[in-house]
Amino acid sequence: MPGTSDKTVYWRNKPEDRNPGEVLQKVYAALKEKGYSPIDQIVGYLLSGDPTYITSHMGARNLIRRIERDELLEELVRSYLEKLEE
């Protein structure tokens, strides 16, 4: 095809988009801003895997889908247990 490039374009996520803790904070803020119960919505998503539990506001749904649910759960448990040790 004339005018097309045969160069490969690479997409790189920003590092903060792969940090489960930061993603959870952004998703929490988006849910809260929209008037949802962030805890209920995040738990619903973690249990079901259904992304419609998460608002698309502020790109929250796209952000949370970049992280595996088990990684999000691991971050939540780690954060909770670390706070117990303080």
Curated annotation (Swiss-Prot):
Signal peptide: none annotated. HAMAP family: UPF0297. Belongs to the UPF0297 family. This is UPF0297 protein STH1998.
